[in-house]
Amino acid sequence: MKKYMCFSLTIIFLSLIWVGCSNTVSSGEDENTSWVFVANEGNYGASDGSISMIDEFGNVYETESIGDVVQSLEVYNNKLIVLVNNSHKIKIYAITTEGISMPGIEISTEGSGPREMVVVDGKVYFTNWITSDVKVFNLFTYNIEASIPVGSMPEGIISDGTKLWVANSGEDTVSEIDITSLSETRHIVGSGPQNLVKHNSDVYVSRTYYSDDWTITYHGASRIVGSEITINNYGSGGACGGSVLSHQSDVYRSFDGGLARMDAELNLEERTIGNYNQSHIYHVEKINGNFWFAITDWNDLNEVRVVDSNGDELFTYKVGQNPGDFALWEQID
């Protein structure tokens, strides 16, 4: 694998001190035109969650602490939307080529425990563990305008523009919601649904669940094709983030230190893209054709590794505490 050196860069900007690392440093004549944002959860209960920002030249900047458990983030137009789980709030920042506006706008979710989100036509649909629902936040009025009851501990959420699919991680169901009527249909997919991806017309689900005494972790995957459900239980194993994503003509799931292709019966191939300690892989996303791995040991190891489709490691970035979700912003001419 190719590996690149990473060094520290400290930048003071206005009243904030941003500390990061980079693989390259841009010249003063080049203008940055993109950002990859990283949600650094921080330590639970410490309110030290932050956002790392990686520019197109590989420079990394980190914001000040913004709350307790920075769970997920999305880009919509020139806005960065952030869900802060244990602070029960939404943060919204304006994005420019120079970064994000601080301190941003803050909206309380009234103790709901927000988790994951999708944005459709100016509305943020986000899951909530404590209230067991999907709330609808309007990006024009800045109001939460609806709440859709779903199953226990809703986690991952995806949309095709007309429907939502929600993984109810505290049980064995996925909720399918019509965006217009907000009506819900539940599909039984097996224990512990976590993350979802739509591939062609099918919805794939990664699952992670536990023994009654929480000492054994089990993994699996499911597929929803209309009303037909395929379920495959993989058995027990090490901790697994359970990412699932579409790549070319196939669907991949995080497994055994990388990403493994799933066959028609949802079995996982032994060959993987990426080769890391499985217990350190917290999240994986595909950005501009490459795979971005959030790597953490919940202590001093907090990195993002970027890997191409051949499994070659392209970049390593040092980021904030306990990195998870990613979001891409690109300047539109």
Labelled PLM ranges:
Residues 17-20:
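C-terminal motif of bacterial Sec signal peptides marking the signal peptidase cleavage site
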Residues 22-333:
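Predominantly soluble domains enriched in secretory-pathway, periplasmic, or organellar proteins
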Residues 11:
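Short, charged/polar micro-motifs that form catalytic or ligand-binding hotspots
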